[in-house]
Amino acid sequence: MLARAGVVKWQLVYTKQAKRDAKKLSAAGLRPKAESLLKILGENPFQNPPAYEKLIGDLAGAYSRRINIQHRLVYEVFEDKKVVKVIRMWTHYE
């Protein structure tokens, strides 16, 4: 899922749903954009740009970045463990 280029300072872990979403992204031709965002998360999950937003409601505590106009990469950050948990990589409006 994540290209091996560059130094990864944060460990990325993926939910089962995120792994399923990765297959959808590949089929939709969105894999390069998603890989670019994942690389940024591995280096610094709070880097801006690209912009991110803190989510509320059911996903309170998580963050979201745009893959495209419809789809978002949703993740949680565990600063104490230097872990980024990727929750979704498709729309979070379903």
Per-segment meaning from a language model:
Residues 1-24, 28-36, 56, 65-72, ...:
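Enriched for short, Lys/Arg-rich terminal
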Residues 39-66:
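A short, surface-exposed loop/turn module that caps and links secondary-structure elements
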